[in-house]
């Protein structure tokens, strides 16, 4: 985190987390994804074929959101792919109700304490986007491990009563849910 501060998560107040906390990483960060892939590959090369290894546990208890500029831009790209036009997005989110129509994609930011909080469609899409980011991150981890040993089954633990991500979607990328 000291060498690559961009891997640290940003909270809803647009403040970057400090080193040392749990779950303080940005799942969107290309640097973080690359470093995790390198670590997963090295660990898999060392341990995947050990007879005591019967299942590979990916990252522990996926959780949380990041509001960094990169995540904001990826959210906008995800929305553009989903809706195509701002007009479609405005209609789907019913933004005219509170006179919050968007006229430029750069105006769209993740819902939170410093931004929009009353647009339910935006909140749901943010949850969907966050799930997508987590799932692609998790699947990249799985793929790195299974590139070393394709027969190795992968798992991650999903927490009870946790609503940040769609667990049914995450489960599609695992061999076993734990």
Which role fits each region the language model picked out?
Residues 3-4, 9-176:
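Polysaccharide-binding and catalytic clefts of secreted carbohydrate-active enzymes
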